[in-house]
Amino acid sequence: ASISNPVNRRNEMMTRMRGFEDYAEQQGHVGVFFTWTAPSRFHAWKTSGNGKTVDNDKYDGTTPRETCSYLAKLWSLTRAALKRNGTPVYGFRVCEPHHDGTPHWHMLLFMRPSDRNKVISTLQHYALHDDKAELERKPVAAPAFTDITPRFDWKMIDPTKGDATGYLAKYIAKNIDGAYVGDDEEANTPADQGALHACAWASWWGIRTFQQIGGAPVGVWRELRRISNAKKHGDLVGPPKPVLQDPRFEA
């Protein structure tokens, strides 16, 4: 079945995520959930002290697609650093919009327990790579930073409180069809309506909502499933046809 169908797409994402989690459990790896948010200058709106949304005077006109490219560049630097340090990770990334349409990233990554602190510090370093001064205390005091969570946040996945796939499930559904989510608290809308908005936003700006990190390419798995389904429904009859007109040329 085609992944252009939202239900099929959501089911495939959940299956792939479950496969990663099962592998992580077999290997004794741990999961960490990360959130990356772009600096203030990428946001057209901001929330004031009284909770109202107002114009952001720091906004430099960057589009959502350009912001996503910025985050992708940070991830490229992060991935290179992790590779240099011998700290491999694998998992999934979800890109979704803030209330003002600015993209932010959620990443669920698996790693060796011994690499966890190094991975966290590396992702934090690059998340705060630019415009770090906007997080500094004013007037200057100790500690130097009030809070880095507007730009970078992380949370350990605790298997006793729920599995990693279940934790990521709502982010997958929120950006496909909103199934089993209820209301989208961040957007303050029913989840199915919020999913329509998220899909339209991603389509308009040409943003890739989901990305697999590490692991085998999904294309082979999809093709094997297609062949399996074709056999099941009798669509494949007789021996497979050679790719070339004359098999002698294969040599």
Regions found by a protein language model. Give the residues of each.
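Short hydrophobic/aromatic beta-strand micro-patches
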Residues: L108-F110
